[in-house]
Amino acid sequence: SSNAELTVEEIVKIRQALFSKNYSTAKRVQSFSSKEDFEKAKKLMIEMSENYKVLIDLFPENTEDEFDTEALPTVWEEKGAFNALMTKASEDMIKLTSVIEDAEDIRGTLKQFMWSNCKACHTRYREEH
């Protein structure tokens, strides 16, 4: 992959920064959506979708034991399932762009297509905070 020239530490920092950015972006998606500013919300949804695709390649084998990672060993033990969840999260953000404007329940729709994936990943693949 294109990350071959990065150090383990750099890879961990990059993936943590991306997850962190997605979280702050998700909060902005929620805010814009609740104000019915759907154009801004959709731009951010697409940004998040792209980030999830990038994240799939940021968990190479050699980064599993990095002291600073919050990722659990289950990421590598269940790599197929983890990658599938990242892909689902990415695809759900794209689906969200097409359903959010007509959603009866904006919060519920965001929960279904966005927050539920965050929760699924944190529950299974991230250390408790």
Q: How would you name each of these model-derived features?
A:
Residues S2-N3:
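Cleavable N-terminal signal peptides
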Residues L6-H129:
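Sequence context surrounding c-type heme c attachment/ligation sites in exported
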